[in-house]
Amino acid sequence: MRISILTIFPEMVEIVKKYGVISRAIKNGILEIEIFNLRDFTNDKHKTVDDYPFGGGPGMVMKPEPFFNFFEYYKERYGNTYTILTSPQGDRLTNHLVKELSEKESILIICGRYEGIDERVTKFVDREISIGDYVLTGGELPAMVIVDAVSRFIPDVIDKKSVEQETFNTGLLDHPHYTRPRNYKGLEVPEVLLSGDHKKIEIWRRKMALKKTMLKRPDLFLNKDLDGVDKVALLDLFRELINNAK
């Protein structure tokens, strides 16, 4: 898969290529990340990318010319590519949307700055995406979040089973995790995890995931279809709650 990013701060975005599973995926030829500097597509010697807004108001607006120049160059090089604009007014980034993006052959992410981009540039945009109901100084961090989230669903980037069991992919929050030592400052690892009984461990983990979801994100149950393991775990959890209430 190819992911392209257009930004005025390429050095900031470059860091996403250097660490962890994304770095390995690039080295293994699974993922290609290409970063473009919008200033390289300006028409003046000062490489100006912003100007004052028509109608007045605070801040600056990103000029249309560099974007149009870039898209002419990019389309000639790669053809039509699914194009995303990072924007606080865009669709909320969700697990479902991340999976949808990961199935595309290539995506292009446009990083906004200042008060925003000239509205005429949006003619090239297929989808605006927001990572939350808050405003950042620019679109570089959202672009990096999108790259990280999407790359996890690309085949062979990480273990398929790990992705399948992750929070939101199962419709539940994740269960608690433990590692050695077994006892640390009087804090014990739950005995069931040391039992070697894989069925009991699976039910315990699902029970803990259900409990955590009910307490922290009950809204997730609205879209959750409970399977057999869920029902057994939920029944076990209810029994535990009833016994504790006695």
Swiss-Prot record:
It comes from the Bacteria. Homodimer. It catalyses: guanosine(37) in tRNA + S-adenosyl-L-methionine = N(1)-methylguanosine(37) in tRNA + S-adenosyl-L-homocysteine + H(+). This is tRNA (guanine-N(1)-)-methyltransferase. Gene3D superfamilies: 3.40.1280.10, tRNA(m1g37)methyltransferase, domain 2. NCBIfam families: PRK00026.1 (NF000648), trmD (TIGR00088). The gene is trmD. It is an enzyme of class 2 (transferase). The keyword tRNA processing applies. The keyword Transferase applies. It is found in: Cytoplasm. S-adenosyl-L-methionine binds at residues 112, 131-136. Pfam families: tRNA_m1G_MT (PF01746). Keywords: Cytoplasm, Methyltransferase, S-adenosyl-L-methionine, Transferase, tRNA processing. GO terms for biological process: tRNA N1-guanine methylation. It comes from Thermosipho melanesiensis (strain DSM 12029 / CIP 104789 / BI429). Belongs to the RNA methyltransferase TrmD family. InterPro entries: Alpha/beta_knot_MTases, tRNA_m1G_MeTrfase_C_sf, tRNA_m1G_MeTrfase_TrmD, tRNA_m1G_MTases_N, tRNA_MeTrfase_TRMD/TRM10. Its EC number is 2.1.1.228. One of its GO terms (molecular function) is tRNA (guanine(37)-N1)-methyltransferase activity. GO terms for cellular component: cytosol. Specifically methylates guanosine-37 in various tRNAs.
